[in-house]
Amino acid sequence: MPDNASAQQPGQPAQGPNEHYHQPLNQPRALRIGVAGPVGTGKSSILATLCRELAGELSMAVVTNDIYTDEDARFLRSAGVLPTERIRAVETGACPHTAIRDDVSANLDAVEDLEEAYGPLDLVLIESGGDNLTATFSPALADAQLFSIDVAGGGDVARKGGPGITGADLLVINKTDLAPHVEVDVTAMVADAERARDGLPVLALSKHDPESIARLADWVRAVLVRHRSGTHVPTDPGPMAPHSHSHDGS
């Protein structure tokens, strides 16, 4: 923060210990897209793909979430998809959904720090730590949500439902190039997903298929156009199902 950031300005409320940076009202805030999905479904690969496709035309940054490590951030930095300083890691220390839905302050701090340091930004991608089929972002953190499943998880995954599958702005069925090896019918899997999503978009994606990558990038561009025009309204896919985790090794 600038040296004078803590000084109270006339007409501003007193600033407490949890002070946040906010984009000036006359500057558009970056579009924030959350990327969620179970462990191993290719979320980091999706982020890397989007950075490669869009960084030449948009000013971008990335925030990753892991429980105890910065593994995803290190993967993206090593891939060279963005300047390393534009990739921030949040170590949640708790269940992945906590930091993207229940208490988003750590992620908001990371996003706002990036906007202050490198703004104005066009796009910030926020990757959730791997969780289950019900993980979703709070609309207070993400303007739009992409949920990733993959063919290696089984051809019936989309039929299992959950708010991420049924209500995210975009459902990605990832790693379609692996379908022959795991005996999954991608066409049937897409059809199941479309039935579950009642008209919301579904994208079959492979990092080896330029056409599917182009469709993914075009989806982001379309959301950004709506965001800039003020016509995009963040929606909440719904809360996670009641559940519990044990992190004490018992």
Curated annotation (Swiss-Prot):
GO cellular component, one term: cytoplasm
Cystine bridges: none
UniProt cross-references to InterPro entries, sorted A to Z: CobW/HypB/UreG_nucleotide-bd, P-loop_NTPase, UreG
Compartment annotation: Cytoplasm
Stretches for region Disordered: 1-24, 230-250
UniProt keywords, alphabetically: Chaperone, Cytoplasm, GTP-binding, Nickel insertion, Nucleotide-binding
Ranges annotated as biased composition (Low complexity): 7-17
Positions that bind GTP: G37, P38, V39, G40, T41, G42, K43, S44
Oligomer and partners: Homodimer. UreD, UreF and UreG form a complex that acts as a GTP-hydrolysis-dependent molecular chaperone, activating the urease apoprotein by helping to assemble the nickel containing metallocenter of UreC. The UreE protein probably delivers the nickel.
Listed name of the protein: Urease accessory protein UreG 3
Organism: Streptomyces griseus subsp. griseus (strain JCM 4626 / CBS 651.72 / NBRC 13350 / KCC S-0626 / ISP 5235)
Gene: ureG3
